[in-house]
Amino acid sequence: MISEAPPFWWRKADWRAWLLAPLSFLYGRIAGHRMAHARRASVSVPVICVGNFTVGGAGKTPTALTLARAAKAKGLKPGFLSRGYGGSLDVTTVVDPLHHRAVAVGDEPLLLAQEALTVISRRRLDGARRLVAEGADLIIMDDGFQSARLAIDYALLVIDATRGLGNGHIVPAGPVRAPIRQQLRSATALLKVGGGNAADGIVRMAARAAKPYFTASLKVRGDDRLSGIKVLAFAGIADPAKFFRTVESRGAEIAVAKTFGDHEHLTEEEIDDILTTAERQDLLIVTTSKDFVRLSGHHGKAEQLAQKARVIEVDIVFEDHLAPGLIIDRAIIACRDRRLKELKTS
């Protein structure tokens, strides 16, 4: 998986995109063939995949959290399935947020584990089976739409309304993971997050393909306003600009903005620079939930930064508040149909 998306991916296609187009054609053929012909193994519970069309953040993790809360409201025991990207463990593991650190299991699984049972596994089928063994009656898979070898009952593709598909090219010329038409064929529905019109084209394509789509927005949790406060904002996520816009929407004045690589663990020197700059300029330090969990469990400067930083937490809020429950219900029905079909053909 590519963790660092070149900036030109998110602008109108230029000479770099066209230069890489032959490689994109080859990559797209391979990715499309895998999606169309991959054998997907089955588990006994519904599987919802929260994915996206492109490399980088679109809001998958907060969407997965929203779906888990909807599942729990229905009396279900959801379980999250993740590859544990950014973590060092390469064995199937139940994530314990009280004992594991992001360096071992990845930052996103640590966030997910605070909400529900979470398993990381390089082989998603093994992870899904472990979740079932642990009592999960619904699996929410964070990413893996294009590559997982696991039967999916409901594939919800999240797209950011501000970034859309970027320059529209497939990796490495652009951020798109596989041919769009192939992705749409395999998708159940789309979720457009935020304002802007960059996603309008793909939404129209989805409508022509008879795929439903939902809309949602990112909402800052709580009533914590930052009006008139000067801050140092730092983020090591796929789209730090989105975080900075969120901070400014709370009324803060960003005096210093620092960006790091997605899933990147800060060095002692980087942490010291943040602390020193904030103290020298009398700035409040603000960061994301993912950056915060990467600091958690450490000592020294990292612990000091974790104590000083204010975390700006965001939730995905569906425009139709019944939509998350509807998605859960549709996944359950699809799972029943899948299981009946398997019984008839066995």
UniProtKB/Swiss-Prot annotation:
Pfam families for the chain: LpxK (PF02606)
Catalysed transformations (reactions): a lipid A disaccharide + ATP = a lipid IVA + ADP + H(+)
Transmembrane feature ranges: none
Pathway info: Glycolipid biosynthesis; lipid IV(A) biosynthesis; lipid IV(A) from (3R)-3-hydroxytetradecanoyl-[acyl-carrier-protein] and UDP-N-acetyl-alpha-D-glucosamine: step 6/6
Keywords for this protein: ATP-binding, Kinase, Lipid A biosynthesis, Lipid biosynthesis, Lipid metabolism, Nucleotide-binding, Transferase
Residue sites binding ATP per the record: T54, V55, G56, G57, A58, G59, K60, T61
EC number from the UniProt entry: 2.7.1.130
Gene Ontology biological process: lipid A biosynthetic process; lipopolysaccharide core region biosynthetic process
Source species, domain of life: Bacteria
Cellular component, GO annotation: plasma membrane
A GO MF label: tetraacyldisaccharide 4'-kinase activity
Keyword Lipid biosynthesis: yes
Family: Belongs to the LpxK family.
Function: Transfers the gamma-phosphate of ATP to the 4'-position of a tetraacyldisaccharide 1-phosphate intermediate (termed DS-1-P) to form tetraacyldisaccharide 1,4'-bis-phosphate (lipid IVA).
Protein name as catalogued: Tetraacyldisaccharide 4'-kinase
Organism for this UniProt entry: Rhizobium etli (strain ATCC 51251 / DSM 11541 / JCM 21823 / NBRC 15573 / CFN 42)
